[in-house]
Amino acid sequence: MNIGEAILFKYPTADPTKDFIVQNNGDGTPSYIAEWNIRAPIPTEAELKTWWEELQSTSAYEPPVQVDLLARELSQEKLARKQLEELNQTLGSELSKIKLQLLTLQGGQGS
Protein backbone atom coordinates (compact mmCIF):
# COMPACT_ATOMS: atom_id res chain seq x y z
CA MET A 1 0.00 0.00 0.00
CA ASN A 2 1.20 3.50 -0.85
CA ILE A 3 0.08 5.69 2.06
CA GLY A 4 0.68 8.97 0.21
CA GLU A 5 -1.41 7.95 -2.79
CA ALA A 6 -4.18 6.65 -0.53
CA ILE A 7 -4.31 10.00 1.28
CA LEU A 8 -4.32 11.91 -2.02
CA PHE A 9 -7.21 9.72 -3.18
CA LYS A 10 -9.25 10.80 -0.15
CA TYR A 11 -7.95 14.41 -0.08
CA PRO A 12 -7.11 15.24 -3.74
CA THR A 13 -6.25 18.89 -3.04
CA ALA A 14 -3.83 18.05 -0.23
CA ASP A 15 -0.19 19.00 -0.67
CA PRO A 16 2.08 16.09 0.33
CA THR A 17 4.84 18.51 1.31
CA LYS A 18 2.70 20.73 3.57
CA ASP A 19 -0.55 18.99 4.52
CA PHE A 20 0.98 15.64 5.38
CA ILE A 21 4.34 13.89 5.26
CA VAL A 22 4.77 10.14 4.87
CA GLN A 23 8.10 8.86 6.14
CA ASN A 24 10.01 5.62 5.73
CA ASN A 25 13.10 5.15 7.88
CA GLY A 26 14.58 2.57 5.52
CA ASP A 27 15.08 0.08 8.34
CA GLY A 28 12.46 -2.40 7.17
CA THR A 29 9.63 -0.88 9.19
CA PRO A 30 6.56 0.24 7.24
CA SER A 31 6.04 3.83 6.10
CA TYR A 32 4.05 6.02 8.45
CA ILE A 33 2.46 9.47 8.62
CA ALA A 34 5.13 11.68 10.20
CA GLU A 35 3.17 14.96 9.97
CA TRP A 36 -0.56 15.61 9.59
CA ASN A 37 -1.80 19.17 8.95
CA ILE A 38 -5.17 18.39 7.37
CA ARG A 39 -8.22 19.52 9.33
CA ALA A 40 -9.41 15.97 9.89
CA PRO A 41 -8.38 13.18 12.24
CA ILE A 42 -5.25 11.24 11.30
CA PRO A 43 -6.49 8.24 9.31
CA THR A 44 -6.32 4.79 10.83
CA GLU A 45 -4.57 1.88 9.14
CA ALA A 46 -8.01 0.50 8.21
CA GLU A 47 -9.07 3.79 6.59
CA LEU A 48 -5.82 3.96 4.63
CA LYS A 49 -6.33 0.38 3.39
CA THR A 50 -9.92 1.18 2.37
CA TRP A 51 -8.83 4.27 0.44
CA TRP A 52 -6.00 2.29 -1.19
CA GLU A 53 -8.44 -0.43 -2.29
CA GLU A 54 -10.86 2.17 -3.66
CA LEU A 55 -7.96 3.78 -5.51
CA GLN A 56 -6.97 0.44 -7.03
CA SER A 57 -10.53 -0.20 -8.21
CA THR A 58 -10.72 3.27 -9.79
CA SER A 59 -8.59 2.85 -12.88
CA ALA A 60 -9.05 6.43 -14.09
CA TYR A 61 -7.59 7.99 -10.93
CA GLU A 62 -4.49 10.10 -11.32
CA PRO A 63 -3.12 12.29 -8.55
CA PRO A 64 -3.70 15.99 -9.28
CA VAL A 65 -0.91 17.67 -11.17
CA GLN A 66 0.74 20.63 -9.44
CA VAL A 67 -0.29 22.85 -12.38
CA ASP A 68 -3.95 21.94 -11.84
CA LEU A 69 -3.68 22.75 -8.14
CA LEU A 70 -2.05 26.10 -8.93
CA ALA A 71 -4.72 26.90 -11.53
CA ARG A 72 -7.47 26.20 -8.98
CA GLU A 73 -5.71 28.38 -6.42
CA LEU A 74 -5.28 31.19 -8.96
CA SER A 75 -8.96 31.15 -9.89
CA GLN A 76 -9.90 31.36 -6.19
CA GLU A 77 -7.55 34.31 -5.74
CA LYS A 78 -9.02 36.06 -8.81
CA LEU A 79 -12.52 35.61 -7.41
CA ALA A 80 -11.43 36.98 -4.03
CA ARG A 81 -9.76 39.96 -5.74
CA LYS A 82 -12.93 40.71 -7.73
CA GLN A 83 -15.03 40.56 -4.58
CA LEU A 84 -12.62 42.94 -2.80
CA GLU A 85 -12.70 45.36 -5.74
CA GLU A 86 -16.51 45.37 -5.69
CA LEU A 87 -16.52 45.95 -1.94
CA ASN A 88 -13.97 48.75 -2.31
CA GLN A 89 -16.10 50.40 -4.99
CA THR A 90 -19.21 50.18 -2.79
CA LEU A 91 -17.35 51.64 0.20
CA GLY A 92 -15.96 54.46 -1.94
CA SER A 93 -19.43 55.28 -3.21
CA GLU A 94 -20.89 55.31 0.30
CA LEU A 95 -18.05 57.51 1.56
CA SER A 96 -18.71 59.97 -1.27
CA LYS A 97 -22.39 60.15 -0.28
CA ILE A 98 -21.47 60.77 3.36
CA LYS A 99 -19.01 63.49 2.37
CA LEU A 100 -21.67 65.17 0.22
CA GLN A 101 -24.16 65.03 3.11
CA LEU A 102 -21.58 66.56 5.47
CA LEU A 103 -20.82 69.35 3.03
CA THR A 104 -24.56 70.01 2.63
CA LEU A 105 -25.01 70.15 6.41
CA GLN A 106 -22.00 72.44 6.84
CA GLY A 107 -23.30 74.74 4.09
CA GLY A 108 -26.71 74.94 5.80
CA GLN A 109 -25.15 75.86 9.16
CA GLY A 110 -22.95 78.57 7.73
CA SER A 111 -25.93 80.59 6.39
Swiss-Prot record:
To B.subtilis XkdW. It comes from Bacillus subtilis (strain 168). SUPFAM superfamilies: XkdW-like. This is Uncharacterized protein YqcD. The gene is yqcD. Pfam families: XkdW.
